[in-house]
Amino acid sequence: MGYPGQAKKLYDTPNHPWQKARIDEETSLVKKYGLRNKKSVWKHASDLRKYRSNARALLGVMSAGNLPEDSHYIRDAQNIVKKLQTLGILKEDAKLEDVLALKVDDIMERRLQTIIYRKGFANSIKQARQFIVHGHISLNGRKITVPGYLVLKSEEDMLSYYVGSPITKEKLMAKPQPASAPKAAAAPKAAAAPAEAAAAPKKEE
């Protein structure tokens, strides 16, 4: 039993602090998906391990055969596949075996921050996070400020800029006009002034 009032950690931290291959992979994911730290990587990696562990156990039981059609093992396998399909992590024709081939990237691609960037609501993955945190993004008309929210497949078309936000796709894609250079335009006149002064007749004393 945990301490009352204290939330339980939802992810497992690495067992060994100094593993170059793992550190390089985590750093690459942080940069690729614009994360603030590695906690999101560890959380999604923990979720993936649970999915794969459950799938592996169910495949072991189901491979033995002789299971009735209403067996809870079959229902559990169907529920895992259906859940991952609903999240858009697995394709519609996927099977339980496909869960074993999933990577952390597959879950990262379903984050709200990633989808906002992929759909062109932001010019960069970091800008997508900024828009979400500052309340410029809505899901089905409601403001959403959680970059790590896993977007359902059915919710992708419900994403938009929040009503009242000054940001639009037109403004985002518009290129700023180059600033005029009045000094450069005045340069020829300034250069011509000494020549005109030299050509002017001198007054007799």
UniProtKB/Swiss-Prot annotation:
Family matches, as SUPFAM superfamilies? Alpha-L RNA-binding motif
Residue stretches making up the S4 RNA-binding domain:
110-172
Biased composition range(s): Low complexity: 174-205
Q: Does the keyword ATP-binding apply?
A: no
Q: Name one Pfam family in it.
A: S4
Organism domain of life: Archaea
Q: How is this protein annotated for GO cellular component?
A: small ribosomal subunit
GO MF annotations for this entry?
rRNA binding; structural constituent of ribosome
Where does the record place the region Disordered?
173-205
| Alphabetical UniProt keywords | Ribonucleoprotein, Ribosomal protein, RNA-binding, rRNA-binding
In its keyword annotation, does this UniProt entry include Transmembrane?
no
Return the InterPro entries for the record.
Answer: Ribosomal_uS4, Ribosomal_uS4_arc, Ribosomal_uS4_CS, Ribosomal_uS4_euk/arc, Ribosomal_uS4_N, S4_RNA-bd, S4_RNA-bd_sf
Q: Which GO terms describe its biological process?
A: ribosomal small subunit biogenesis; translation
> What HAMAP family does the database record attribute to this sequence?
Ribosomal_uS4_A (MF_01306_A)
Give the multimer and partner information: Part of the 30S ribosomal subunit. Contacts protein S5. The interaction surface between S4 and S5 is involved in control of translational fidelity.
Family, per entry:
Belongs to the universal ribosomal protein uS4 family.
What the protein does comes down to: One of the primary rRNA binding proteins, it binds directly to 16S rRNA where it nucleates assembly of the body of the 30S subunit. With S5 and S12 plays an important role in translational accuracy.
What is the designated name of this protein? Small ribosomal subunit protein uS4
This chain's source organism reads Methanocella arvoryzae (strain DSM 22066 / NBRC 105507 / MRE50)
